[in-house]
Amino acid sequence: MVYFSPRGMQPCSPAGEIAMMPPSKSPVMESAASEQNPAQQSQQQDEQSAKRACPLKFSIAKIMEPDHRPSQVPPPQPAPVSFATNDDDEDEDPEIDADSERSCSPIEVISLDQSPSTVNYDSAFKKYVPGPCSGATSSVASPPSTAAVQQFVSSRHQELLSQYPLLYYAPNQLMCAAAAAQYAALTAQQQSLASAAHLSSFTASLNASLHHSQSLRRNLGHPLAAAAAVAAVAQSQAVPNLQHTLEKSPVAQRTAQSSGLQANLKRKRSPQDQGEVTPPPASTATSATGARSRSPSPQGSIEDSSPGSASGGKPKTFSCLECGKVFNAHYNLTRHMPVHTGARPFVCKVCGKGFRQASTLCRHKIIHTSEKPHKCQTCGKAFNRSSTLNTHSRIHAGYKPFVCEYCGKGFHQKGNYKNHKLTHSGEKAYKCNICNKAFHQVYNLTFHMHTHNDKKPYTCRVCAKGFCRNFDLKKHMRKLHEIGGDLDDLDMPPTYDRRREYTRREPLASGYGQASGQLTPDSSSGSMSPPINVTTPPLSSGETSNPAWPRSAVSQYPPGGFHHQLGVAPPHDYPSGSAFLQLQPQQPHPQSQQHHQQQQRLSETFIAKVF
């Protein structure tokens, strides 16, 4: 018996037994020995058996060394152990001593067979496998012991190969590389065959259940037939589906595609089944599986439509720490944060208004141009953006989707609805620094500040009364003068719209219109032009303050003074705070002049703080 020591691949014999390893012979030496007559061979074998009575010691390093012997072995060439010729008998003892000196662990094997082994062990363990007994030595050695050694070594060889497949790697190209590739190919083939067998059995059971359900629906006319078919399919799906590796294996994909094609061909060939619609096996299995559905795509790949996959939608994982709002991307959360920080890094270069996003600034820039391509079909009013036109169309339709929960008042726009809700909260966060009056909205405070600096940009054409807001002017004309809410109904010069656009933006820039010759931005024409006061009538000298006034209208008025176009009182009848120009310059009162300077300083301070 041959035992393997726990130190690795070094075999050893049990205690009390003396064994000897047969010498490894080259093919040339074996062919030379076979040409001799049987008598010489038997004589040489008897001599060799007598010489091998001593124990043989060698190491695994000696075995793993490459064979440097030439094809024709001369007598003086040293060999590890050779008993082929009689000329080597004299040099056997020094070679044995040299082998014993190089030995790291003793190996003692007893065997009398010299013929090569019929079994080819192409690995690092082939040196330990003794060959079968020849007919000449069968009478000397006992066949049962040799067969036992052969069987043990063979089984041990296969066991080591199964436990240590990486031992196919050998230094100096001693082991065959093709054996490792063959082993890997066989392993992959066995795995694929096992998966294919599992898949085929599952497909067969599924087809059987589907055939049973189809036969029930075809043969039975009772309404319970469909319920029985669904129950059968659900029972077949109660068994766990294929493993994830089987679903991704190419064998499983090809089998599923072939089964689907066969089912389609069967449905096309059978004319009696054309009237009923039967789902294919792939679709039935997909519909029965609710948690994770997989269906083959037309390109042959498997599309995962599970809720957590990319096709099913990304989970929202980014939440705002301030308000708790959840976003599906970090970019959206970054865009949302300026709502809480109040940062408005994108500033308009024309009016100085700030915005949180660059896209909002781009939309805002349109109002500074004269382009209004979007026109209302009902009233003919034009707008810069289509969204503004859509919001305006709600006025004609009477659609007010935003309704207050407290008072039931409806609004066309969401912004107006939010501003109205602040009136019910009771909180007035915007307070005037001059009179300590508080407001719910910031734009109400902005309009209130005009009362302190005597700025009323919106003036009535009938009575010349000034207003801070265009809304107040429309309300005044509608109630007092019984004129429509839209100022366009009046016969006004075309520069009125320009003046209205200018005065609407005047509070935003403190430096606009300070001097009569200063250029100010004009939103309607896109150019720089001096501010135009529409309420100023023509001068008595024949020069007009507004080029829009025709000279014919100038000539028909007397040169003695101003004459209002609508037949109202002349400008000297109006108070000093009127928007009309006076012919005779009045001497300002010292107290009024001091009050005016104080109001001007307050307005500059307010504008510096707000804007």
From Swiss-Prot:
PROSITE patterns in the record: ZINC_FINGER_C2H2_1 (PS00028), ZINC_FINGER_C2H2_2 (PS50157)
Listed GO CC annotations: axonal growth cone; neuronal cell body; nucleus
Composition skew (Polar residues), residue ranges: 252-262, 513-547
SMART domains per the UniProt record, alphabetical: ZnF_C2H2
Gene3D superfamilies recorded: Classic Zinc Finger
InterPro entries, alphabetized: Znf_C2H2_sf, Znf_C2H2_type
Disruption of the gene: reported phenotype: Results in abnormal expansion of type II neuroblasts and in ectopic expression of pnt and grh. Simultaneous RNAi-mediated knockdown of N partially restores normal neuroblast numbers and prevents loss of pnt expression. Simultaneous RNAi-mediated knockdown of erm with either HDAC3 or members of the Brm-associated protein (BAP) chromatin-remodeling complex brm and Snr1 further increases the number of type II neuroblasts compared with the single knockdown. Simultaneous RNAi-mediated knockdown of both erm and the ETS protein pnt restores normal neuroblast numbers.
Effect after changing L389H: In Fez-1; Reduced protein stability resulting is abnormal expansion of Type II neuroblast lineage due to dedifferentiation of intermediate neuronal progenitors (INPs)
Quaternary structure (record): Found in a probable chromatin remodeling Brahma-associated proteins (BAP) complex composed of at least brm, Bap60, Snr1 and erm. Within the complex, interacts (via N-terminus) with Bap60 and HDAC3.
Protein's UniProt name: Fez family zinc finger protein erm
Encoding gene (name): erm
